[in-house]
Structure formats: C-alpha cells, structure tokens
C-alpha cells in the first residue's frame, strides 16, 4: 500500500517550520508508568492519567498526585514499579484504567477499566465505584475506552467478548 501526504512532500520535511511536531517535547518521562489515557476536568485542570498500577493520577502543576483508585483490593502488590511490564501479573487485582472521560455537568470521572468494566469517581477522587460490568447480559471482558455525549450518554468499547488483557 502506498500513501501520499495530501499536504505535499514539503510538509513531511524535517526542517519545515509548519511541522508543529518539531516543537514538541516529551513531558513526564519516567514519572508515570504506562499512561493509557489522559483527560482534563470540566474546569480545565489536569491532565489526569490512568496508569499501569491501577491508579488515576492528577498533575497539580508541580507533581503527580493520586486522584483515584480502580480496585477495592489495592495492596502493596500494586505499588509503583520501575517498568510498566512489572504490573501485568497483578493487573486483574490492581485494575488497569484504559479510558478516561469527565462528565461535564457533574464533574464525575468515568473510567474504562480492562478488568472491572465501567467505573465512576466523583470530582473529589477516591475509590471508583462500578457503573456496569456487563452489557445486555454479556460480561465485559476488556473494557477499553469510552466517550460521553452532551446528554450524558456513555459510549464504550469492549475489545473482546472472550479474552481479558492478560
């Protein structure tokens, strides 16, 4: 398959002043492990990021702080580790937040968790509570991402009806 940039070859050149990616920088390197999704709350604060150990973190302008937990079974096995791969064997216990979206009207954060389905936590954070673990009687096996429309309807993806992430 061949692809041609519709903006022309000049757009892809390294020295193109219109290429905004040249001005980008990597933020928070080695500060958070395995961020999958980021979101900003209705007041524009954040980012909030779901990470590999099951937490949702909040950037307060100076550092990352805990905002929410996705597992009621959180213990020392869920403590931060140096590599995202270190979390795989305990994800089913610690949780794995893959999608984050704020409800604009309430400020609640909805979380798509690979193991615990759809969760929600209030604007103050804390332990997220389940919204649902099934759809039309079929258990959610790999809840991956979500979005919320203006009326508050939640749309989500469940990437497998058979397999979980691990």
Language model segments and positions:
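Short active-site oxyanion
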Residues: 23-26, 44-47, 107-108
